[in-house]
């Protein structure tokens, strides 16, 4: 089958009775047939090698069809039409060095980054076999440079890990605590195995996108590649969609560009609408922290959806991942679910009132109710923002004692949620130190007068 495909690609550009338009139509539909045949017949390494052959065969055939004279190497910004990137923006062209790196295995040592490789529309593959056990990127060169600076060695979290993996009923593989875990304990610190720019994930033509996935995965060491491929999902695209965590890469003078990071160890944690583990991503590194005390044998969970959504919406979003939510809240008595939704509506209303500075809809005690509802609802990973609003509200009413008390609570929770050096944590420490000097001091008390 593959020999036939390659023969067609070699012969079509040379056929004197075909117009250029007919050549292009034949070559356009060929990649899908070739992609299907090698995807279901050959393993990853052989598949990538065959895709290299296809890519080079197409480049050579297209060039010979366009001109009888020897083709000169073009500048990196220009390139002749190529059927593998049909209907996409103009690609970055292949220089002689690019072709050499594309066809041959990376010649660089394992102590340095390889790439850019296989660039399409400014999106390229980068990899490092030794960095944090192996990492691959599918992104632009400028964002790859930033991420490469991010990817420092990490300590891995608690040693030995206070959890183990096992099959959990109705959920598949999950993690359970092997000993009691205290609130705030760092469980895992992991660098990503694969990082994909959101734009490349969503906008590249499927055949080109999947080829870049295969090349990136093939660049990983076997243990990292196996860990990625054993995640839930039909194919690489589905595994990224199901198991990745989004973060933003900030270049100079630009808004954050969304990227999807795959962390196979962290992805083993199942969903719960009231999770006991919180995570934060800093410079592409994910840190997981116990958001409350966890008993031995208890499952470790994170939330895959916005925990402030009503139960019906949470369940609908969970179904998009191909499973039903099996958490205690969603599977519990209906009256408890109804009560939970009522608390969530009240939380949303109080938040709006606390943020409303045009109308006096709150009292000094509103913040107390707001934080109490978070605690009752089990929103442990969001107590920092709740205490922050309460502390600011007390400051607005000129209540020094309780403003300081809630600011200290907020700083403690925010240190867990966002990190001890986060701007929000420092802001609350500043409020606790001198409430009277804060810009909010007494503002609502003045309005009351």
Question: What does each of the following model-derived ranges do?
Answer:
Residues 2-5, 15:
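Cysteine-centered motifs
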Residues 8-12, 21, 44:
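Acidic, Ala/Val/Gly-enriched low-complexity intrinsically disordered segments
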Residues 2-3, 30, 34-183, 401-449:
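Accessory low-complexity/Zn-finger-associated flanking regions
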Residues 185-274, 320, 326-329:
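Catalytic cores of histone-lysine modification enzymes
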Residues 260-405, 412, 426-429:
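C-terminal SET catalytic tail plus cysteine-rich post-SET Zn-binding segment of SAM-dependent SET-domain
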Residues 18-20, 27, 39-42, 61, ...:
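Residues marking helix boundaries in flexible regions
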Residues 139-179, 183-206, 267-290:
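Conserved AWS/pre-SET-to-SET junction and N-terminal core of the SET lysine methyltransferase domain
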Residues 9, 85, 99, 125, ...:
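Secreted/processed peptides and extracellular or luminal domains of membrane proteins
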């Amino acid at each position: 089958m593959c020999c036939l495909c390659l023969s067609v690609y070699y012969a079509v550009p040379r056929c004197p009775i075909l117009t250029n338009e007919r050549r292009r139509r034949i070559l356009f539909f060929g990649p899908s047939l070739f992609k299907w045949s090698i995807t279901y017949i050959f393993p990853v390494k052989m598949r990538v090698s065959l895709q290299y052959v296809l890519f080079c065969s197409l480049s050579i055939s297209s060039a010979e069809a366009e001109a009888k004279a020897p083709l000169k190497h073009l500048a990196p910004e220009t390139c002749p039409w190529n059927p593998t990137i049909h209907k996409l923006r103009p690609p970055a062209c292949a220089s002689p060095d690019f072709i050499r790196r594309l066809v041959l295995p990376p010649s660089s040592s394992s102590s340095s980054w390889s790439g850019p490789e296989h660039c399409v529309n400014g999106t390229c593959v980068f990899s490092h076999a030794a960095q944090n056990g192996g990492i691959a990127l599918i992104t632009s060169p400028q964002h790859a440079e930033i991420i490469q600076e991010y990817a420092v060695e990490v300590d891995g979290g608690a040693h030995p890990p206070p959890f183990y993996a096992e099959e959990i009923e109705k959920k598949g593989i999950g993690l359970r605590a092997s000993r009691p875990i205290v609130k705030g304990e760092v469980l895992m610190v992991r660098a990503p195995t694969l990082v994909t720019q959101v734009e490349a994930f969503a906008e590249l033509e499927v055949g080109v996108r999947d080829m870049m996935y295969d090349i990136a995965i093939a660049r990983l060491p076997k243990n990292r590649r196996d860990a990625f491929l054993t995640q839930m999902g039909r194919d690489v695209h589905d595994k990224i969609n199901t198991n990745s965590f989004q973060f933003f890469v900030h270049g100079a003078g630009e808004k954050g560009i969304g990227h999807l990071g795959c962390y196979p160890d962290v992805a083993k944690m199942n969903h719960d609408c009231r999770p006991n583990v919180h995570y934060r991503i800093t410079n592409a590194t994910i840190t997981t922290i116990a958001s409350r005390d966890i008993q031995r044998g208890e499952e470790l969970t994170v939330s895959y959806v916005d925990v402030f959504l009503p139960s019906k919406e949470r369940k609908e979003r969970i179904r998009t991942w191909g499973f039903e939510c099996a958490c205690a809240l969603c599977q519990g008595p209906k009256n408890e679910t109804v009560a939970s939704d009522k608390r969530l509506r009240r939380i949303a209303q109080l938040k709006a009132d606390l943020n409303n500075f045009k109308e006096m809809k709150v009292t000094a005690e509103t913040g107390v109710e707001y934080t109490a509802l978070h605690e009752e609802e089990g929103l442990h990973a969001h107590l920092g923002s709740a205490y922050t609003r309460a502390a600011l509200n007390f400051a607005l009413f000129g209540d020094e004692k309780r403003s300081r008390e809630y600011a200290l609570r907020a700083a403690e929770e925010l240190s867990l949620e966002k990190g001890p050096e986060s701007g929000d944590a420092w802001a609350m420490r500043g409020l606790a130190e001198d409430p009277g000097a804060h810009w909010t001091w007494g503002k609502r008390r003045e309005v009351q007068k």
